[in-house]
Amino acid sequence: MTDPSRTFLYVGTYTVSLPHVQATAQGIYAFERAADGLMQAIDWYPSLPNPTFLDVHSEHNLLFACGEVDDIEEFGGGGVSAHTFDPETGALTMVDRHASGGEWPCHVRLDEARSRISLANYKSGSIQTIPYGDDGRFVEGAFNVQHEGSSVNQERQEGPHAHSTTLDPSGTFLIACDLGMDMARVYELDGADGPLTHRSDLVVRPGSGPRHFDFHPNGRWAYVLNELSATIDVCNWNGDAGTLTSIQTINTLPDDWDGPVSTADIHVHPSGKWAYNSNRGHDSITIFAVDANDGTLTLLGHESTRGKTPRNFALSPEGDRLYAANQDSDTIVVFALDQETGLLSATGEIIDAPTPVCLKFVLR
């Protein structure tokens, strides 16, 4: 049983306002789960502007953060920062920074096997990988791929908008969701500083806007969250060929909802029994049951996030809590997750955090 007093939570935030968000934060915020199970604030730590999305390497005590802007002078665009964290106190120290190879990097993913990170640059529509050393500092060998294309939504899909990257379970392939191109593009990986080789594309319904992606724990099924249509494409994953095949498209919002449509994040429970996604506008978490035979989804219900504009959310390391980051309410609301039904219920714990965007747990 994990000692709950040694669980850290890092929160990525907006520190500079953008057209879609009014920033209130100063950097990356750290919390520690106390003996009573409640999160207590440690401090905030400086980073690049808008350290929104994070990823962590628990074994090497490393944290990487996007700098989601387009005007860092030394880079001519966005950036990414590398931090070490103290395993005893959770304190962060920024040790390096690097150009993201584009504008508005909105997602970072760690590739531990190759000691490199991958970035999705939303505004410029590109993917970049950057290798790093054991100390977290970046080394030579960055590789950039520029996406080309558009789709039917003239306001949001006038060009490519890479939104996330995800490694497949074998670590052989990288899946890049591009909201502007209506596709999840699959790349094969080659070495720590080698190229990304385009292998296949999953093309979703026009105007869907793929945003985030998650694999089922069995590695055979995958889930593409579409921001603009508020749908999920359930896919079969062929790990030999590196291909995705959609077998179901399901709505995330109630049929009678006529308000804003904008999904944000998706996660499959470690048990594989349930999948969850966040809905901005509706300000909710959608709860699905996962069919044990084919991975398809059945709607179980919706749970209000008790705040405005839920972005990323995180399942606790034990899988018995869900933490929802309400960007425009400056709160993280904690829900109990029923291990028999998958349903959520508010615990009453509300963590104050300015403009929270991304949540990452670290066990020590």
Predicted regions and their residues:
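Short glycine/acidic-enriched loop and turn motifs that connect beta-strands
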Residues: 15-19, 69-74, 123-126, 181-183, ...
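Blade-loop segments of beta-propeller domains
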Residues: 40-114
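Blade-level signature of beta-propeller repeat domains, shared across WD40, Kelch, NHL, RCC1
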Residues: 327-333, 338, 345-364
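A short beta-strand motif characteristic of beta-propeller blades
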Residues: 40-46, 93-98, 143, 149-155, ...
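Loop-centered beta-sheet repeat module
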Residues: 171-230
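Beta-rich, blade/repeat-based domains predominating
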Residues: 48-58, 101-116, 148-170, 204-221, ...
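Short loop/turn segments immediately following beta-strands, especially the blade-tip
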Residues: 31-37, 83-90, 129-139, 187-195, ...
